[in-house]
Structures are given as structure tokens and as C-alpha cells.
Curated annotation (Swiss-Prot):
Cited InterPro entries: Elp3/MiaA/NifB-like_rSAM (IPR006638), Methylthiotransferase (IPR005839), Methylthiotransferase_CS (IPR020612), Methylthiotransferase_N (IPR013848), Methylthiotransferase_N_sf (IPR038135), MiaB_methiolase (IPR006463), rSAM (IPR007197), rSAM_horseshoe (IPR023404)
EC number: 2.8.4.3
Gene3D superfamilies: Methylthiotransferase, N-terminal domain, tm_1862 like domain
Source taxon at top rank: Bacteria
Gene: miaB
SMART domains (UniProt xref): Elp3
Cofactor(s), by name: [4Fe-4S] cluster
Family statement drawn from the similarity comment of this UniProt entry: Belongs to the methylthiotransferase family. MiaB subfamily.
Binding residues annotated for [4Fe-4S] cluster 2, in chain numbering: 169, 173, 176
Cofactor detail note: Binds 2 [4Fe-4S] clusters. One cluster is coordinated with 3 cysteines and an exchangeable S-adenosyl-L-methionine.
UniProt-recorded name of the protein: tRNA-2-methylthio-N(6)-dimethylallyladenosine synthase
Every Radical SAM core domain range: 155-385
């Protein structure tokens, strides 16, 4: 494995601001950017106006994320005029798209650094070069390198942490741009993953979320071969670790071995995010998802049989090209059959460079929105019903801090990922406590520590 390039010659030290759009992988990338800059002596600020360096870590999964970047870059023009020494950097998946970096440079010539996802680890070097030579940098690395280990990381949370176990994706769903911007699947060795988790535990962390675009593909590129089920069992034996979660799973790769590992490993939380995208086999085929409705429901049945108290969540795309009313009704019926605890629902958004962008049978926007509203209504009704079942139960909660809505209450999550606001002792923050659920709300639970 490569080691991170180290620089110690940045002249003037100042404050930096990072804004992040997108998934948990992007969040962890931003934590690494922050870690690298803090190692160089920079201080993080939450105010753009105070920053000497502003970094936008971008997402391109949906058009809305890109529009936010354009809008925010426009706002920075005024800041740059007031402070010509301000350094503005743009990185992330959006920049990795073909021609996008050049487009950003043309529209926003005041941007100083534009890099992609594959050379993020060299950011301190690029920053140093810009400051020394009074120049701008546009460097998009087309091909991914081997995994960079031992990068400094500045984690936002002091008790829960993301640990990336693999990068990239080999699935090429017809609507998705991730394989083009994140590269092919590359797995970290189990030893490196274990070492990172052990270090986190020594720093007081209680809960780890194993991250990957498709964690169920973990280890296929390693020699000797290691499966995701193997990794889960290894991680479960680490002393001091309280909880383990993972995301995201691809249904086609969620094997019986993985389901069995979740069921028998006591530190594995009873929560699985299993994106279905559509309940129609016809649409799933057009999406290139490599499973049909029957296969997906079979996987769900196995999960519920071995993990009866499991909380399932999913992703659903509404209005994929060619989606008929019949296809949409099949999605609704699948949602009702599975009874998800929660679902992330999205309107289909054309992504340039993906096969689906060229499909001719695009669904009208008004039809998409009507279907979307119908779906959300069903999802919310089921979520409320699932939450209601917690009333009167005693649940283990990892206490994360005070409630955002009531400073007199604490907040945390159950093993199934339910948000709980409850009356309790502030000395419990950072600990696992038992909470009696006294009331179920639409998107959270209310309780009291016992």
C-alpha cells in the first residue's frame, strides 16, 4: 500500500473551511482533508468569511447536488474580490466527470485548485504549490491508484466513526455515475481495517460503520480471498468495540453467509440498508441491477427469518425511464410487503455519461412528482407503524449528546438505528444505556433512561 505524501513547507498557516455534499464516503474524505490540513498547522473554521482556504467536496449522483455547487461557487466570487489571497479549491466526484473540471475553471476562473477523487491525498502539496508560485492547479487523475493508508483524519464525532473497507464499484447500474468517478473496486486488507478500528477504540470510540459503495463485494480483489462475512466475524472479535454497522449493500451480493454473520455476531447492529430502487422486474432489468423482484424478496425473507427484529431501510428511484403506472404500482406493493423502517426516495435525475441518459422513454416531470408523493405517503405510514411497535419496550441506546429540539433531553440511537430523545443523566453521554420508549413519533422515539 502507498503511504500518504507528507509536506511540511506550507509557509503561512491560516484557517480552512470545508463544505461537503453527498454520501458518507464524501464525509470521510472531508474528514481526511481536515486531518491533513490540521497536521500542517491549519485551524478549521465553520465560517466561510474567516477562512484563508475554502474547499468544496462535491457530489454528482443527482443534478441537485451539482446545482448547489454552482450556486455556492457564484457566492464565493465576492469573497475572493474582498480577499485576493483567499484560496478556493473544488474536489470530489463532480470534478471526476469528463470535462467538468474544465467547465468549472471556465465558469469560475477564480477557483485556485481543482482535483478529483483519486489524488485527494496530495492536497497539501497542491496548496503549497499555489501559495508559493501564485498559480492555479487543475489535476484530474483518470485512473485510481492503490489505496493510500495512514492518512490523518479529523473525525467530527467522538464516539462513532466511519471506516472505509473498500473503494469504487464494478456494478455499472445504468443510472449511476459512481463507477466512472470512484473507479473500480479496491479492498483494504483486513489487517489494515482492524488496525484502524483498534486505534479508534483506544481513542474512546464505541461504534464503527464499515463503508463501501458495495460492501458485499469486499475482498474479491484480495489475495488470499476474504469475504465480507469473514471480515464481519473478524471485526466482531475486537475487544472494546461495542457496535458495528455497515453500508451500502447490493442485494445481488448479499449472501446467506453475510446474513448468518449478522445474526450470530453480537456487535453487529440489527439494521440493514438494502437499496431496491424499484419493485418492478422490468425496470430493475433496465437499471442493470442483476436481480429481479422475486430475488430481492427472497433475500428479505431470509434476513427476517434469521434476524427477526431487523430494521430495513432502502433507496427507491421514482420515474426511471420507461416506468409505467404498472411498474410504479409494483414498487408500492413491494414497499408494503417489505415494510421498511425508512426509505430514501428520489426522483430520477439524468446523469450525463450514463446509459440511462440516452433512454428515449423519459417519464414526464409532473408524473414523477405525483408518483413520488404517493410513495412518500406510503413510506411514512409504514415508518410510523414500525415506530409505534417500540412503545413500552426497553432499548439499548448509544447516547450521543443533548437533543437538538430540547436541551433538557439527551439523544441517541438504538441498535436498529432509531433516533431516541429521552430524559436522562448527562453523565451518560458517550455510554450505552437502557431507555424505556414511552412515545413513538413519525421519525423518532421519545423515552426515559432506566
Amino acid at each position: 500500500m502507498n503511504e500518504i505524501l507528507n509536506t511540511k513547507d506550507i509557509n503561512a498557516i491560516g484557517e480552512f473551511f470545508i463544505e461537503t455534499w453527498g454520501c458518507q464516503m464524501n464525509e470521510e474524505d472531508s474528514e481526511k482533508l481536515s486531518g491533513m490540513l490540521k497536521k500542517e498547522g491549519y485551524i478549521r473554521t465553520e465560517e466561510r468569511e474567516n477562512a484563508d482556504v475554502i474547499i468544496f467536496n462535491t457530489c454528482c449522483v443527482r443534478e441537485n447536488a451539482e446545482l448547489k455547487v454552482y450556486g455556492n461557487l457564484g457566492i464565493l466570487k465576492g469573497l475572493k474580490s474582498k480577499n485576493p489571497n483567499l484560496i478556493i479549491a473544488v474536489t470530489g466526484c463532480m470534478m471526476q466527470q469528463k470535462g467538468m473540471a474544465e467547465t468549472i475553471k471556465k465558469k469560475f476562473p477564480f477557483v485556485d485548485i481543482i482535483i478529483g477523487t483519486h489524488n485527494l491525498h496530495n492536497f497539501p502539496n497542491y496548496l503549497n504549490e499555489v501559495k508559493k508560485k501564485d498559480t492555479s492547479i487543475l489535476k484530474i487523475q483518470e485512473k485510481e491508484d492503490s489505496i493510500i493508508e495512514n492518512m490523518p483524519i479529523d473525525r467530527k464525532n467522538s464516539m462513532k466513526a466511519f471506516v472505509t473497507i473498500m473503494y469504487g464499484c464494478n456494478n455499472f447500474c445504468t443510472y449511476c455515475i459512481v463507477p466512472y468517478v470512484r473507479g473500480r473496486e479496491r479492498s483494504r486488507t483486513p489487517e489494515n481495517i482492524e488496525d484502524e478500528i483498534k486505534k479508534l477504540i483506544s481513542e474512546g470510540y464505541k461504534e464503527i460503520t464499515l463503508l463501501g459503495q458495495n460492501v458485499n463485494s469486499y475482498g474479491k480483489d484480495l489475495e488470499p480471498k476474504v469475504t465480507f462475512a469473514d471480515l464481519l466475524e473478524r471485526v466482531n472479535t475486537i475487544d472494546g468495540l461495542e457496535r458495528v454497522r455497515f453500508m451500502t449493500s447490493h442485494p445481488k451480493d448479499l449472501t446467506d453467509d453475510v446474513i448468518e454473520a449478522i445474526a450470530k455476531c453480537d456487535k453487529l447492529c440489527e439494521q440493514i440498508h438494502l437499496p431496491v430502487q424499484s419493485g418492478s422486474s422490468e425496470i430493475l432489468k433496465k437499471m442493470n441491477r442483476h436481480y429481479d423482484r422475486e430475488k430481492y424478496l427472497d433475500v428479505v425473507s431470509k434476513i427476517k427469518k434469521l434476524i427477526p427484529n431487523v430494521a430495513l431501510s432502502t433507496d427507491i428511484i421514482v420515474g426511471f425511464p420507461g416506468e409505467t403506472e404498472k411498474d410504479f404500482e409494483e414498487t408500492l406493493s413491494l414497499v408494503k410487503e417489505v415494510e421498511y423502517d425508512s426509505a430514501f426516495t428520489f426522483l430520477y435525475s439524468i446523469r450525463k455519461g450514463t446509459p440511462a441518459a440516452k433512454f428515449e422513454d423519459q417519464v414526464p416531470e409532473d408524473v414523477k412528482h405525483k408518483r413520488f408523493n404517493r410513495l412518500v405517503e406510503v413510506v411514512n405510514e409504514i415508518s410510523a407503524k414500525k415506530n409505534k411497535a417500540y412503545e413500552g419496550k426497553i432499548e439499548e441506546v448509544l447516547v450521543e449528546g443533548t437533543s437538538k429540539n430540547d436541551e433538557n433531553k439527551l439523544m441517541g440511537r438504538t441498535r436498529t438505528g432509531k433516533l431516541v430523545n429521552f430524559i436522562g443523566d448527562k453523565d451518560s453521554i458517550g455510554k450505552l444505556v437502557n431507555v424505556k420508549i414511552i412515545k413513538a413519533n413519525s421519525f423518532s422515539l421519545t423515552g426515559e433512561e432506566i
